[in-house]
Amino acid sequence: MKKSIAFGVLILAILSFQINSAFADKSAVSIEGPTKVDKGTEVPLRITVTHNANSSSHYTEWLKVIANKKEIARWDYTTDKRPEAAQFTREIKIKVEEDMEVIAEASCNKHGSRGPAIHRISVK
């Protein structure tokens, strides 16, 4: 009986850890900007990162922006040089000469990324 109770407690502890890991706070990104522009137009893009923490032990470690498979912007953060807040925004300008796929992704130093955000811009 004691063995089965101990085994049950162990299983609950493992499941609890797995559930917490699955819902751990990962850095998430959103992209705001126009979706259709004239060829040659320089457009602003707002990249917003959302994270639950911004302390010396738990913060967004990096943010990168890729346009048509080429990295066009990157910010790296450290314990001593963290983002200004748990949620923050970066603005970039990009000249659109052809249809573009812009991908932004950020990563938490402990839990990783929720995955990339994708924004498509079409040339009229």
Locations of regions flagged by a protein language model:
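Aromatic sugar-binding surface patches on proteins
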Residues: 82-91
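Extracellular Ig-like/FN3 beta-sandwich strand-entry sites
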Residues: 42, 97-101
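Short edge beta-strand/loop segments characteristic of extracellular beta-sandwich folds
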Residues: 44-52, 91
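Beta-strand signatures of extracellular beta-sandwich domains
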Residues: 61-66
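Solvent-exposed serine/threonine-rich low-complexity stretches and specific carbohydrate-binding patches
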Residues: 71-82, 120
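N-terminal edge beta-strand
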Residues: 23-44
